[in-house]
Amino acid sequence: MKTETRTEIEAAVFRRLVNHLDSRKDVQNLDLMNLSGFCRNCLAKWYSAEAVDRGEEITVDSAKEIVYGMTYGEWKDRYQK
């Protein structure tokens, strides 16, 4: 498989995962962490770290907006139990 194709597939899988998590707002981060060892916040931290490794300055808060589809504070107010 070509590197470019693999990268495109991985990006599509990431978007699907983010969309899936967005459709399951009933699943709390704590539940994700307890069951799988990662949560939405972890995805945001990884996103930010990978961007920085590639010379892009994306804060964790900005990455959370990508993962949550809104600010983290807004998501917490609406969906965190």
What are these regions (language model features)?
Residues 1-81:
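Domain-level signature for proteins that mediate thiol-based redox and metal-cofactor handling
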